[in-house]
Amino acid sequence: DALFQVIWGYNIVTVLAGVFVWFAIPDTHPSEANGKEHTPDGSISKHIVAVLRIPAVWMQAVILLCAYVAYKGFDNYSLFAVDAYGMNEVDAAAIVTIGAWLRPVAALGAGLLGDRYNVSRMLALSFLFLLASDLFFAFTTPIAGAVGILLGNILIGSTAIFAMRGLYFALLEEAKVPVVMTGTAVGLVSVVGYTPDIFVALVAGIMIDANPGATGHQHFFVFLSTFAAIGLVVSLTLMRLLHRNKAAQH
C-alpha cells in the first residue's frame, strides 16, 4: 500500500510538472508569419555538426557524466552505512533520507550562486567538495557507531551532488550556445552524460562482491573520487575557456 502511494505520488507530480511547463514556459518554436512557416536556418544535420564543433558542449557532456556518476553513487550510501558503520537498515535509510532532503535547497542555492558568480565556478567548487567527501570515505577507517561523522560527510557529499544537478544545463547559456541549437546540444550532452545509468551500479556490485564489507565500498569511493577529480579539472578548464572567450570579445 505504501509503494502504491509512492507510485501515485510520482505520477501526480510528473503530470503537474507537465501542465506547469505547458502554460508557464513560452512557446519559442518558429510560428507562421505571412502565411508561411519559418524554420531555423540550416538543416538538423548542420546543427548537429555545428554543435559537435563547440568545445564547451563536449566539456559540459563530461561534466554531466561525472556529476551523474556521483548521483548514481548516492544510492550506495545506505548500504555503506550498514556494511562499514554497523548501522541497521532503518537507521541507515533515515540518514540517507536526510541527505536526500537537501535536493531542493542545494539545487536552488547553487543556481542562485551560479547566477551571481558564474555556473562553471560553482560547478568546480561543488566537485571540489564532492572529491573531498569521496576521498574521506575511501581512505579513512570506518568507526562503528560513528553516526555523526557518517552523517556529516554524507551531507557534504549530498550538497555537492544536488548542487551540480541544479547547475550543469545552465552551462549552455554561459557558453553562449545559440538558442536555435539548444535542443541539439542538450541531446548530445544527455547521450554522453547519462551513460552512468548503464555502468555505475554494475561497477559498485562488482567491487563490493569482490571485497565484502568496508573494503569493497572504499574501492567504490575511489572510483567515485576519480570521476569527481575529472569533473573538477574539466570545470576549471571550461571556466578558463569561457573567461578567455569573454575577454576576446571585448
Where are these regions (language model features)?
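Helix-to-loop junctions at the C-terminal end of transmembrane segments
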Residues: 106-119, 208-209
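Helix-loop-helix hairpin linking two adjacent transmembrane segments in secondary transporters
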Residues: 1-25
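Juxtamembrane helix-start elements in MFS-like secondary transporters
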Residues: 3, 87-96, 150, 182, ...
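C-terminal transmembrane helical hairpin of 12-TM major facilitator-type secondary transporters
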Residues: 118-171
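Multi-pass alpha-helical transporter architecture, strongest
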Residues: 19-24, 220-250
